[in-house]
Structures are given as C-alpha cells and as structure tokens.
C-alpha cells in the first residue's frame, strides 16, 4: 500500500505540473493589448489641444483638473493617449512618454499567469470612484510590473471595471469616430508602434517575450490590435518614440507642410516637428511601412 500510495502521489504531482504548464501556455500573451500610452507634460492643455484640434483626433475623455492633477484622453484608433500633469510637475518641462498601460485578460487569470511565468508584479491598486449607477465602487485597477518599469517609465496592467466602463464598446466608438473623420487631416489609421530604448536588449527581450510571447519576424511584439513594441539598443531607457500609420503619406506630408509641423524625414517616413509638440518624437509612416 505505501508503494502504491507513493506511485499515486507521484502521478498526481506529475498531472498537476503538466496541468499548470498547459494552463500557463494556454494564454499567450498575458495581456490583450496596449490600452493607453501615458504622456507627462508641463502644459497638458496645449498638448491635448494639438491632438484634439490640430490633428482632429477623437476625445476619449475631456481634459480635467482635480486637486492639481490634470488628465485628458485622445483616441488614436487602436489605443488611447493620456496626457497628464501631476501637481508637482514643473510647468515649463517638455513632454515625455512616461508609461504604458496594458489591458489584461481578466485580472485574476492574468496574475495567475504572471506567477506561472515568474514575472513579478505589485499588489493590485483599485481606484474607487462614482460609478454610472450613482454608487461608489472600483472604477479601475492597476498592477505595476517592476521588471519592465524604469525611472521615468511605468509599465503596468490596467483593468477597467465593467460597472464603470465597457472598454471594448468605447474602443469601437472611438475607432468609428476616427473612421468617420477619415483620420483627420493627417489621415490617421492607427498607432502602429511604440519604440522603447534599452541599455540591455538581450535582457529586456527575454522579459518582453515572457510577457507577450515570441516576437514576430520583425523582432517586434504585438498583442491584439494594439501597437507593436520595438526595443532599440542604446539611448538610455524609456519610451523613445511612437509611430502613427496614415492612409496616405503624401496627404500627411502636405498637411504637415501647410501647418508648419514638418520635421526630419527618413526612409520610413517623417517626424512631426518636435518643437511644436513639446519635444515628443512622433514618426509618421504609410500603412505598409510599419
């Protein structure tokens, strides 16, 4: 009997291990897609107006101020841009890409999968607010991912409560508004890529592969309909640049020239003049160039 019990126990352990491995491999990547890109600005209203008025992109949420914290959201087709300023942020500072928020699969599942993959995460933090029903409850929950975050760049999971916002519905609404406006004067189709500078590409590539799965042939990672993630060796650590894909490079070029927004050009496309957008790097490419 002891021997049989030992054999049975070994079989059960092997089954559980195999089940855990299968469960861990079942959902790759852990996240659905990038939900929004965080941009910190000393003058967020000016930058918000550039996207909302000059580029005529749909407003995801209006710019508001609460106890010195200013935040506004812009829809870029497949992802949002959050432009904000902390109360302590100097008003004369340039803008910078300071964070990347990922929409996870249901958060309990995502946290379990992170644990299986050996990816550390912080304690979930719920933001309590007034819900559309009139009651108070959790509006969204964030979970920091310290293995990916760097000074000046926060990488985190961000899950909306369905009682506060149905994210898929809002994403479709914003995408439809962009389509109806034909992408604004720029002819925007989507935000196709986020470029992240790293001092150790091998280390960070392994980390991103653990989170998002095997990279594409291009070397980039993509989750769902969100922008691709591209690692670039050198130049410090943090989000360096975002890429906007447009229907017609010629139309976009004409608009940038007429608006005095044209920056440097390259084989891939052209940059918006950084001096007009508080120092941000925004590359414009054709749909087939990404």
Regions found by a protein language model. Give the residues of each.
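Positively charged n-region of N-terminal signal peptides that target proteins for export
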Residues: 1-6
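Bacterial N-terminal signal peptides
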Residues: 8-20
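An N-terminus-focused feature that recognizes amino-terminal "leader" regions
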Residues: 26-85, 94-97
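Vicinal oxygen chelate
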Residues: 32-42, 72-74, 90-187, 190-200, 217-220, 226-233, 253-290, ...
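Surface-exposed interaction/gating patches
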Residues: 34-41, 161-165, 173-217, 221
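Amphipathic alpha-helical segments
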Residues: 44-58, 109-117, 200-215, 252-258
């Amino acid at each position: 009997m002891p021997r049989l019990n030992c054999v049975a126990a070994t079989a059960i352990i092997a089954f559980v291990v195999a089940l855990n491995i299968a469960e861990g491999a079942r959902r790759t990547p852990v996240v659905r897609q990038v939900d929004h890109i965080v941009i910190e600005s000393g003058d967020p209203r000016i930058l918000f107006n550039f996207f909302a008025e000059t580029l005529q992109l749909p407003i995801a949420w209006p710019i508001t101020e609460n106890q010195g914290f200013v935040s506004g959201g812009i829809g870029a087709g497949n992802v949002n841009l959050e432009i904000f300023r902390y109360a302590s942020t100097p008003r004369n500072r340039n803008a910078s890409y300071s964070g990347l928020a990922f929409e996870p699969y249901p958060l309990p599942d995502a946290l379990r999968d992170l644990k299986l993959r050996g990816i550390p995460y912080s304690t979930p933090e719920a933001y309590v607010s007034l819900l559309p029903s009139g009651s108070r409850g959790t509006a969204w929950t964030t979970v920091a991912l310290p293995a990916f975050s760097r000074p000046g760049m926060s990488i985190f999971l961000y899950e909306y409560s369905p009682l506060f916002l149905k994210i898929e519905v809002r994403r479709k609404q914003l995408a439809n508004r962009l389509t109806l406006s034909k992408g604004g004067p720029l002819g925007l189709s989507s935000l196709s890529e986020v470029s992240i500078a790293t001092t150790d590409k091998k280390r960070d590539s392994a980390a991103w592969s653990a989170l998002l799965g095997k990279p594409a042939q291009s070397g980039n990672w993509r989750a769902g309909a969100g922008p691709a993630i591209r690692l670039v060796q050198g130049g410090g650590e943090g989000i360096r640049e975002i890429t906007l894909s447009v229907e017609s490079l010629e139309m976009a070029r004409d608009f940038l020239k007429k608006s005095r927004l044209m920056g440097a050009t390259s084989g891939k496309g052209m940059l918006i003049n950084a001096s007009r957008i508080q120092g941000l790097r925004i590359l414009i490419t054709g749909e087939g160039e990404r």
